[in-house]
């Protein structure tokens, strides 16, 4: 059995890890932490887990977690995971960070967008945790930086096109996210009266996920990619629908675009390329680790419109983290994740 610890178990991504791992046959959770609920049973904090776990929350105790676990998930604010990772790696414990500490190729980008105290990247064998692109690197890594939710939806939709030089590098992205993407902590903007029957844009052209997108899309393209990103919060609990507007380099039809996607993802269980004319919906991936991809060619303007749908808490966070864990420990990649989406 793989012995697992979770730092930050009472945030949305932490409790989603526990939900998904409850059916993982090769995992046992040995340690969970919460600064807000230390000493309480996880089932008292989240009654949805009643009967699945008999474990109480600790305060953040790195030495204790490392002594009991083979791998730890960190779902903490920026800067914390790097400190935990250094101690864990010394003891041979693997780390999967659901925050931003290990997403970037260079520390300066992280510092510019996230700030805070940070131990840096030196001496840590790490990988960017998008399995469909970096599976081999993930397998060899001690620390994996789980991608952000928006970048996951965007990168999966665009990498095949950029690698095959189908589109140019000036891309406009419009993303709609469920309220859970704003996190567990309450704020006036996220209460029911503010969110219900309302969609609002936020951090347009200045969202912290932009440099992550640019980094990965530029690597796929082989040249610098320019991204204009407009995120929105919508009155639903889960899900991200990203719509990407790209200029075609040549006059390709629907069937040719489909073949580019189908060939790239032919061996990827969690990415489903929809047939031409079918568009993705967040409802059809709800509660699952799947990404659905659709597209449309606007012949009048030479624009390719790409659409992706994911569950922001699963493929956009905790499910993808478990997928990375499975790869790191060389077990079936679908373990704990082979779940039919919830419908309706």
From Swiss-Prot:
Quote the subcellular location field of this record: Cytoplasm
| Pathway recorded for this protein | Amino-acid biosynthesis; L-arginine biosynthesis; N(2)-acetyl-L-ornithine from L-glutamate: step 3/4
Q: Which UniProt keywords apply?
A: Amino-acid biosynthesis, Arginine biosynthesis, Cytoplasm, NADP, Oxidoreductase
- Reactions catalysed: N-acetyl-L-glutamate 5-semialdehyde + phosphate + NADP(+) = N-acetyl-L-glutamyl 5-phosphate + NADPH + H(+)
Query: Source organism's superkingdom?
Result: Bacteria
What InterPro entries would the database entry show?
AGPR_AS, AGPR_type-1, NAD(P)-bd_dom_sf, NAGSA_dehydrogenase, Semialdehyde_DH_NAD-bd
Q: What is its EC number?
A: 1.2.1.38
GO BP annotations of the record are:
L-arginine biosynthetic process
Keyword hit for Oxidoreductase: yes
Name the enzyme's class: oxidoreductase
Q: Which Pfam families match?
A: Semialdhyde_dh (PF01118), Semialdhyde_dhC_1 (PF22698)
Catalytic residue list: 149
List, alphabetically, the PROSITE patterns matched: ARGC
GO molecular-function annotation terms? N-acetyl-gamma-glutamyl-phosphate reductase activity; NAD binding; NADP+ binding
- What coarse category fits the chief subcellular location reported for this protein? cytoplasm
- Gene Ontology cellular component annotations, sorted alphabetically: cytoplasm
What's its job?
Answer: Catalyzes the NADPH-dependent reduction of N-acetyl-5-glutamyl phosphate to yield N-acetyl-L-glutamate 5-semialdehyde.
Give the UniProt family note: Belongs to the NAGSA dehydrogenase family. Type 1 subfamily.
In Swiss-Prot or TrEMBL terms, this protein is called N-acetyl-gamma-glutamyl-phosphate reductase
């Amino acid at each position: 059995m793989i012995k697992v610890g979770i730092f930050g178990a009472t945030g949305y991504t932490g409790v989603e890890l526990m939900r998904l791992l409850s059916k993982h046959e090769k995992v046992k959770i040995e340690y969970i932490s919460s600064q807000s609920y230390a000493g309480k049973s996880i089932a008292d904090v989240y009654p949805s887990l009643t009967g699945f776990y008999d474990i109480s929350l600790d305060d953040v105790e790195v030495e204790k977690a490392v002594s009991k676990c083979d791998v730890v998930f960190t779902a903490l604010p920026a800067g914390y995971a790097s400190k935990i990772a250094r101690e864990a790696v010394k003891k041979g414990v693997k780390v999967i960070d659901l925050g931003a500490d290990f997403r970037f190729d260079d520390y300066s980008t992280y510092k510019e967008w996230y700030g805070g105290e940070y131990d840096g990247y030196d001496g840590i064998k790490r990988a960017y945790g998008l399995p469909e692109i970096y599976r081999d690197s993930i397998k060899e890594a001690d620390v994996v930086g789980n991608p952000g939710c928006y970048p996951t939806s965007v990168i999966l939709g665009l990498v095949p096109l950029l690698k095959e030089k189908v589109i140019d590098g000036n891309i406009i992205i419009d993303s709609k996210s469920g309220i859970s993407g704003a996190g567990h902590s309450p704020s006036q903007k996220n209460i029911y009266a503010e969110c219900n029957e309302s969609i609002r844009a936020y951090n347009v052209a200045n969202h912290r996920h932009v440099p992550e997108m640019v980094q990965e899309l530029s690597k796929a393209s082989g040249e610098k990619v320019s991204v204009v990103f407009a995120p929105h919060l919508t009155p639903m609990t889960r899900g991200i629908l990203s719509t990407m507007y790209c200029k075609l380099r040549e006059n390709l039809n629907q069937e040719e675009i489909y073949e580019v996607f189908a060939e790239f993802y032919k061996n990827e269980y969690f990415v489903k390329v929809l047939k031409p004319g079918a568009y993705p919906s967040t409802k059809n991936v709800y509660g699952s680790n799947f990404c659905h991809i659709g597209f449309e060619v606007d012949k009048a303007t030479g624009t390719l419109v790409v659409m992706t749908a994911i569950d922001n808490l699963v493929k956009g966070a905790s499910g993808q983290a478990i997928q990375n864990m499975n790869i790191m420990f060389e077990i079936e990649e679908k373990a704990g994740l082979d779940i039919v989406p919830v419908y309706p």
